[in-house]
Amino acid sequence: MILPPEAHPLANALAFTFTSPTYQRFSALLVGAVLTTGRRTVANVLRTLRHLAPGHRTSYQRVLSRAPWSGLRLGCALMRFLLEHLVPYGPVQLVGDDTVDGHKGERVYGKGRHRDPVRSTHSYTTWRYGHRWVVLAVLVEFPFATRRWALAVL
């Protein structure tokens, strides 16, 4: 998969966290995620890439479900890249957040019942079934933006 030259530093920083075949599929998914409009599912990304993503679609879905890579190592590599390139000086501001991602169905692994703080009030509690994601992000100021962006790393 040919990456644009602007993406080479990021791709090189993340390459050591994957095996070679997994990295080839990951880079294809990365490019497809940037180009895809609408929901960024693996199926939509592959539909956008069409013949640029060789192999069967299940090999790309396995990158997220079964391939041997560590999300912690990937997050640390991404954090290192962000600190070196986007936040080279001054204090680093980190933001934490949690959100409930609703999943319906009997075959969703690891789902639970979580209190939804956005929809709940003091007198009424709203429950959602699904996964609770806790996210750590780095606040970055871009010259073209009026506000800081939170780039998720873990």
Please report, for each region that a protein language model flagged, where it lies by residue.
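Conserved, well-structured functional cores that handle cations and Mg-NTP chemistry
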Residues: M1-L154
